[in-house]
Amino acid sequence: MSTAAKRRLIRDFKRLTSDAPIGISGSPNPDNIMVWNAVIFGPPETPFEDGSFRLTLTFTDAYPNKPPTVRFISKMFHPNIYANGELCLDILQNRWSPTYDVAAILTSVQSLLNDPNPASPANVDAAQLFKENLKEYERRVKKTVELSWVDNADEIEAEVVEADEGSSS
C-alpha cells in the first residue's frame, strides 16, 4: 500500500472524527484502511429526512490523486444513484481534486440527496418521477427511508446476537 495514501487517509479520519459535518460519520475498516464504512443521515426537511444510509468508500494507492469508489449499501431511490449503489457525482469523476477529503466527499453525497441532477441520471425512473411527478418521487424516497431503518436494525440485531454468543462462552 502506498504510504502517501495511508498517511492521507489517517489524516482524513482524524479530521472527520474531530470536526465531523452534521449528519455524517465514517471510519476505516479495522482490517483495511483502504476500505471505509460510512453513514449519511438524510438531510432535514427533505424526503430523505430520518433515513440512515450506509455506504462504502474504496480507495486505491492513487488516493488522493484519484477519487475513491463510493457505493451505497442501503437501497436507494435517487436520480443519480445506480441500482448497484454507485453514484453519478461530478466530484467523483471529472471534477475530482486531491484537495477533497473524506468529509468533503460525504458532505457532497449528502447534498446530492436533496439536490439531484436529473439531467445526468443514473436511475432514469427516479429522474423522470423527480421531473414529472414530484409527489410520487417523494413517496418512493420515503419508502427508501423506511427500508434504511430495517437495514440498520438487522445489522444492530446481528451485532447484539454476536455479543451475546461471545459472552456466554
Swiss-Prot record:
Gene3D superfamilies hit by this protein: Ubiquitin Conjugating Enzyme
Keyword Nucleotide-binding: yes
Domain UBC core: 4-150
Catalytic activity: S-ubiquitinyl-[E1 ubiquitin-activating enzyme]-L-cysteine + [E2 ubiquitin-conjugating enzyme]-L-cysteine = [E1 ubiquitin-activating enzyme]-L-cysteine + S-ubiquitinyl-[E2 ubiquitin-conjugating enzyme]-L-cysteine
Highest taxon above the source species: Eukaryota
Pathway assigned in UniProt: Protein modification; protein ubiquitination
SMART domains to which the protein is assigned, alphabetical: UBCc
EC number in record: 2.3.2.23
Family listed: Belongs to the ubiquitin-conjugating enzyme family.
Functional summary from the UniProt entry: Catalyzes the covalent attachment of ubiquitin to other proteins. Plays a role in transcription regulation by catalyzing the monoubiquitination of histone H2B to form H2BK123ub1. H2BK123ub1 gives a specific tag for epigenetic transcriptional activation and is also a prerequisite for H3K4me and H3K79me formation. Also involved in postreplication repair of UV-damaged DNA, in N-end rule-dependent protein degradation and in sporulation.
Protein's UniProt name: Ubiquitin-conjugating enzyme E2 2
Organism field: Cryptococcus neoformans var. neoformans serotype D (strain JEC21 / ATCC MYA-565) (Filobasidiella neoformans)
Gene name of this polypeptide: UBC2
